[in-house]
């Protein structure tokens, strides 16, 4: 099993290219099933979850080809959905990735039937699929859950437009319903919809393929269904979580970094907290520069919340920052009930953290000490790498398969910025 070894003490300096967004490319790849011709998706990150989604699409019968790009947009994937004949998504592929549930809406909407195994993914708390099921039922779907599978069908040919109000904000629930509504008969209204940039990116992709959607990025989305989407091309937006992770890493190490072709407007909450921590930040239309040279960060308080609030996917990274910051920082997690699993590993490095329910109180220390640690989920693994970058000695991070689900070549990118980091098998 692979491990990552980090030797701390070197400030990160230089330029980095941010990959396409993991949380956007997965629903967009699912949405290609709605088209009646090939769809080319560019700026695709090379991640374990992307490979899993490709394998799922191929299992359904779709033709999938990956093309390596030589320009800034990177690699592209072309999906030809015209060969889809299978409507069952098996457990052996689904078990490693929760986003596989995003195939439910497109399969049901286009083929009138879908059978998707209940999903897996990071073990960071309960993320039920009941919102997906109820949303699709509002469009006329008949759904049961039997033997670990969601079994859905449409008895009257096509899904019918309807109105659905989410009990709680659900990103993947909004995406599933949005895709299904795009080819349903009539008008659908989605209330209390997720407003995340990745939802907007999916909507813009659907529109590029012929969908009629208004209100994406607001709590109310209106979809006028069309019979089928067309083929086309679309470029995935840059990954805001990877962007934030590299910014925090640079701030922690007292470095300087420049990023081009990013979306600063999707990172207001993160950039605000980094400024509060003492970083000097310059923002352009599609660029971010951060300078923390010669300074120790100040602790920050934060509470996770749905977009445009502070993203839960950046909570672990800011906890790592607070571990070596000056002062005491309080972090409240409101999205998932089990997302402090990285705390025990940070304690092994010498961090001072006290947990009180859904709140972590972090007393900053001047330095951490390298030690063997174990990744427990995707973002926790990133926080351990960040902590290793500022720890004395070597930090060895085990179970990094979590990391490969969401970060493309993170050791190569950090190494290019000056970090002493390597993968060990």
Curated annotation (Swiss-Prot):
Q: Does the keyword Cytoplasm apply?
A: yes
Which UniProt key words apply to this protein? Cell cycle, Cell division, Cell shape, Cell wall biogenesis/degradation, Cytoplasm, Peptidoglycan synthesis, Pyruvate, Transferase
A Pfam family matched in the record: EPSP_synthase
**Any one Gene Ontology molecular-function term assigned to this protein's record:** UDP-N-acetylglucosamine 1-carboxyvinyltransferase activity
Q: What is its EC number?
A: 2.5.1.7
- Enzyme active site: 122
Which pathway is this protein engaged in?
Cell wall biogenesis; peptidoglycan biosynthesis
Binding residues for phosphoenolpyruvate, per the UniProt record? 22-23
Identify residues that carry 2-(S-cysteinyl)pyruvic acid O-phosphothioketal: 122
State the source organism's domain of life: Bacteria
The keyword Phosphoprotein belongs to this UniProt entry's keyword annotation:
no
> What HAMAP family would the database entry show?
MurA
Q: What does this protein do?
A: Cell wall formation. Adds enolpyruvyl to UDP-N-acetylglucosamine.
What is the protein name given in its UniProt record?
UDP-N-acetylglucosamine 1-carboxyvinyltransferase
What is the scientific name of the source organism? Xylella fastidiosa (strain 9a5c)
């Amino acid at each position: 099993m692979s491990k990552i070894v980090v030797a701390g003490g070197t400030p990160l300096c230089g330029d980095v290219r941010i990959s396409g967004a993991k949380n956007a490319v997965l629903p967009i790849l699912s949405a290609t099933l709605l088209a009646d011709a090939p769809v080319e998706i560019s700026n695709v990150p090379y991640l374990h979850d992307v490979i899993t989604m490709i394998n799922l699409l191929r299992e359904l019968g779709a033709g999938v080809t990956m093309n390596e790009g030589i320009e800034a947009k990177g690699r592209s994937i072309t999906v030809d959905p015209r060969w889809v004949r299978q409507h069952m998504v098996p457990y052996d592929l689904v078990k490693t990735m929760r986003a596989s549930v995003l195939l439910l809406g497109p399969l049901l909407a286009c083929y009138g039937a879908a059978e998707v195994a209940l999903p897996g993914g990071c073990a960071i708390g309960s993320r039920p699929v009941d919102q997906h099921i109820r949303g699709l039922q509002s469009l006329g779907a008949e759904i049961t859950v039997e033997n670990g599978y969601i079994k859905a069908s449409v008895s009257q040919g096509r899904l019918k437009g309807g109105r659905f109000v989410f009990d709680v904000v659900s990103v993947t629930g909004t995406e599933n319903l949005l895709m299904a509504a795009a080819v349903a008969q009539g008008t659908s209204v989605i209330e209390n919809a997720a407003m995340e940039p990745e939802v907007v990116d999916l909507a813009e992709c659907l529109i590029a393929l012929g969908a009629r959607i208004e209100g994406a990025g607001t709590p109310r989305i209106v979809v006028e269904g069309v019979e089928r989407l067309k083929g086309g091309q679309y470029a995935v937006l840059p990954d805001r979580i990877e962007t934030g992770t590299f910014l925090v890493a640079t701030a922690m190490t007292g470095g300087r970094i420049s990023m081009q072709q990013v979306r600063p407007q999707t990172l207001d909450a993160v950039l605000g907290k980094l400024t509060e921590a003492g970083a000097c930040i310059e923002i352009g239309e599609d660029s971010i520069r951060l300078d923390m040279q010669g300074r120790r960060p100040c602790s920050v308080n934060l509470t996770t919340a749905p977009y445009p609030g502070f993203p839960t996917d950046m909570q672990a990274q800011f906890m790592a920052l607070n571990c070596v910051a000056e002062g005491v920082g309080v972090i409240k997690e409101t999205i998932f009930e089990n997302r402090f699993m990285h705390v025990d590993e940070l304690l092994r490095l010498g961090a001072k953290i006290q947990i009180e329910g859904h709140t972590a109180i972090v007393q900053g220390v001047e330095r951490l000490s390298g030690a063997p640690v174990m990744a427990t989920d995707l973002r926790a693994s990133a926080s351990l790498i960040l902590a290793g970058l500022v720890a004395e000695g070597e930090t060895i991070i085990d179970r990094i398969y979590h990391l490969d689900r969401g970060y493309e070549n993170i050791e190569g990118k950090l190494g290019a910025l000056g970090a002493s980091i390597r993968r060990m098998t």
